[in-house]
């Protein structure tokens, strides 16, 4: 198992949680972004900078991900693609996307996109709460423990 992080929009506090988990477990972890993402110098923690552009980082993750890898992303279409390839997808808010839930999330995303394109103000996501941070860390720990066995 490897961890792939869609680091372009990943909150710093979540990146720090991922780094701590990778350090503790030794799982290989790669942060993929179109800008420099500072990561500690560890043999199992990497940063991959891709060219700027629409979905370039997402496409790189999809190209490299393998079954049973874990992708950290809040990008619903990316989560759908990696789940289709047999990987796990976890949002930075602690939601584990599954084959059963991702289609509904895509429908909601598409509906909100339609509303925004018609001029309706939908607002952005709320700030990351302590509960969501804890939920993320707990899900990450459970996934890593499952695959360490």
From Swiss-Prot:
Q: Name one Pfam family in it.
A: DUF188
Origin: domain of life: Bacteria
InterPro entries according to UniProt: UPF0178
Residue ranges of the TM segments: none
**UniProt cross-references to CDD domains, sorted A to Z:** PIN_YqxD-like
Which NCBIfam families does the protein's record reference?
PRK00124.1
Task: Give the family, as the similarity comment puts it.
Answer: Belongs to the UPF0178 family.
Output this protein's name. Answer: UPF0178 protein VV1_1847
* Native source species: Vibrio vulnificus (strain CMCP6)
